[in-house]
A protein has these predicted regions:
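Helix-turn-helix/winged-helix DNA-binding modules
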Residues: 31-32, 52, 139
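Hydrophobic/aromatic-rich alpha-helical bundle segments in the mid-to-C-terminal region
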Residues: 105-115, 119, 134-179, 187-188
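Short hydrophobic/aromatic patch on the recognition helix
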Residues: 44-54
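Alpha-helical DNA-contacting segments of helix-turn-helix folds
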Residues: 54, 61-68, 108
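Hydrophobic alpha-helical connector segments
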Residues: 63, 70-103, 113-114, 123, ...
Length: 188
């Protein structure tokens, strides 16, 4: 979680945000066992400042996880999935995840954390996939859980392509949506 402190100043919030941004970048590139000194340098702060905000790696990872889940959940809520066509909603889902790629990619490094993240984010995606099957857009020979696994894998690949600057946000989202839909679209 974010540090709990009586310090509610904008400076405190900016420093906390800088630390989380730096941690997301460093951890997505080097893994969650990366040296915290690297996180501090990337954030433009001293190690002592880092430890004032987050007492240890676990506290930093917990805060980063909460931040990532909040960011993706906000984007999914704002995406209007229930009002969009299934195809458009899938592209919006991909765009939401790719847009917070570094933060979400960190979650994927730890299976327990990833399962917790998917637990919180799965419901709207399961609903979308079930709607796709029900309306005949998505194939009905695969259960929602399997389609969800394929979608999750597609999300991760789109994030990686964007992080490596192989594709921009919009390109990665659109290409991944086409890839997913081409494989899961209902057959005539």
């Amino acid at each position: 979680m974010a540090p709990t402190s009586s310090k509610s100043s904008p400076r405190f919030d900016r420093t906390s945000a800088a630390i989380l941004d730096a941690a997301a970048k460093v951890f997505s590139e080097e893994g969650t066992s990366a040296n915290l000194a690297t996180v501090a340098v990337t954030a433009g702060i001293s190690r002592a400042t880092l430890y004032r905000y987050y007492a240890n790696r676990e506290a930093l990872l917990e805060a980063l996880t909460a931040d990532a889940l909040d960011a993706v959940a906000r984007r999914l809520a704002d995406a209007g999935l229930e009002r969009a066509t299934v195809e458009d909603a899938i592209e919006r889902v991909l765009r939401a995840f790719v847009a917070v790629g570094d933060r979400y990619a960190v979650l994927t490094g730890d299976q327990t954390t990833l399962e917790a993240a998917h637990g919180e984010l799965a419901a709207p995606l399961h609903d979308l996939l079930a709607r796709g099957i029900r309306t005949g857009v998505l194939r009905d020979d695969l259960p929602v859980e399997i389609l969800y696994e394929f979608l999750a894998a597609t999300i991760l690949k789109a994030i990686k392509l964007n992080q490596r600057h192989r594709l921009g946000l919009e390109e990665a989202s659109a290409a991944a949506a086409r890839f997913f839909l081409d494989g899961t679209r209902a057959r005539d």
